[in-house]
């Protein structure tokens, strides 16, 4: 990113740093990766993903705490032993997830992703059965939000990156209970927008959020799904205008979870689910997406062939000053039907690549 070399860039991740103590001792990562008692506690980066899911990353080793699933072999941790030996929280069963249960005396009990409490024995800390958890003191030694606020104060431009971990809280065998951002991300957004409203929200997510606060307080939002091998660089190039983003939403983004029926109701017609049957106001509709230019559709022509094939032709003109893709989407509605039909339904779409400013592309789409 040569364009950034002359810029004064400040970074803050907005995450708290914490230490753990138990029975008068600190908790630290041993040479074999296991969590053990120590005179001096290790500092951990606390990441909150919402719905009670936390991860803790050792500042010293750069690895995440987790409860191991496999039996010990050699120096590997035993079944359920708490250890920091993974550089990322990414697996089918993400054992780096912990839940934090506050106790009346101010301590906490940590539980693993299956809600088994963390307990201690002579070999270390474990979590693989229902038993009484050991009280642990979790002390915040650095407030991540306050550090981020100090970093953005007075800056010309701020990029605020929020979003999800693609395998925590929402995937096969896990359903979300909310459409909101994690509480700590909401708090960070509020504080950053208050201190420096010239902030662009960079959102990495595989599913919809309710973003009313961001829409009200920030001038722009740019979003990408996760999963690409060079995701950060691609997003940076889009933000810097090296290329123009031109994605489209593959899901409806609702204003509120109250607009959705019960999660076990699979009748999309009765429940008015998806863009095809939902008749309320949405945050962003299915197929929505902007880019760094604008387009006009001209010279429409529609003809019917063989009583079943619609042939649609049109010109797509770039009316702005930046080259970009456009995604032409054709929707249809059944005005008369003896059975319930969608309000509208996507019939066809085509991505037109890299239309230059002022130029146009002619399209013909056969649609059944």
Regions found by a protein language model. Give the residues of each.
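Lectin-like carbohydrate-binding module/patch detector with strong preference for beta-trefoil
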Residues: 2-155, 160, 172, 180
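Secreted, periplasmic, or luminal enzymes acting at the cell surface/secretory milieu
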Residues: 1-13, 204-325, 329-333, 341
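Loop/turn elements at helix/coil->beta-strand transitions in domains of secreted/extracellular proteins
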Residues: 154-158, 196-200, 217-219
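Short proline/glycine- and polar residue-rich coil/turn motifs
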Residues: 351-360
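Conserved small/polar residues in nucleotide/adenosyl-binding loops
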Residues: 361-367
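Active-site His/acidic residue clusters
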Residues: 164-187
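Short beta-strand and strand-turn-strand segments in soluble, beta-rich domains
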Residues: 337-351
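Redox-cofactor binding/interface segments in oxidoreductases and associated redox assembly factors
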Residues: 160-161, 223
């Amino acid at each position: 990113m040569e364009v950034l070399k002359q810029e004064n860039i400040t970074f803050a991740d907005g995450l708290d740093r914490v230490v753990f103590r138990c029975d008068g001792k600190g908790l630290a990562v041993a040479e074999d990766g296991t969590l053990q008692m120590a005179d001096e506690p290790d500092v951990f980066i606390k990441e909150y993903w919402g719905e009670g899911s936390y991860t803790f990353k050792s500042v010293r080793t750069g690895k995440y705490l987790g409860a191991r699933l496999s039996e010990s072999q050699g120096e590997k941790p035993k079944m359920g032993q708490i250890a920091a030996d993974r550089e990322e929280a990414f697996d089918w069963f993400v054992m780096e997830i912990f839940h934090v249960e506050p106790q009346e005396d101010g301590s906490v009990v940590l539980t693993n992703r299956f809600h088994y409490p963390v307990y201690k024995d002579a070999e270390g800390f474990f979590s693989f059965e229902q038993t009484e958890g050991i009280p642990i003191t979790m002390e915040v030694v650095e407030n991540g939000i306050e550090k981020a606020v100090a970093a953005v104060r007075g800056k010309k431009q701020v990029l605020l990156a929020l979003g999800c971990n693609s395998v925590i809280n929402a995937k096969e065998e896990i359903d979300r209970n909310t459409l909101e951002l994690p509480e700590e991300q909401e708090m960070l957004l509020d504080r950053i927008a208050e201190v420096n409203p010239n902030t662009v929200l960079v959102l990495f997510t595989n599913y919809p959020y309710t973003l009313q606060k961001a829409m009200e307080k920030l001038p722009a939002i740019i979003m990408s799904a996760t999963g690409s091998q060079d995701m950060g660089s691609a997003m940076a190039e889009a933000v810097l205008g090296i290329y123009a983003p031109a994605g489209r939403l593959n899901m409806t983004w609702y204003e509120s979870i109250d607009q959705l029926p019960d999660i076990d109701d699979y009748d999309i017609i009765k429940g008015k689910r998806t863009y095809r049957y939902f008749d309320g106001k949405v945050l962003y509709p299915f197929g929505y997406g902007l880019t760094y230019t604008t387009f006009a559709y001209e010279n429409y022509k529609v003809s019917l062939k063989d009583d079943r094939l619609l042939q649609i032709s049109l010109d797509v003109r770039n009316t702005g000053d930046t080259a970009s893709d456009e995604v032409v989407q054709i929707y249809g509605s059944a005005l008369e039907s003896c059975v319930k039909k969608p309000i509208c339904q996507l019939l066809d779409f085509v991505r037109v690549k890299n239309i230059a400013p002022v130029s146009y592309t002619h399209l013909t789409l056969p649609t059944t």
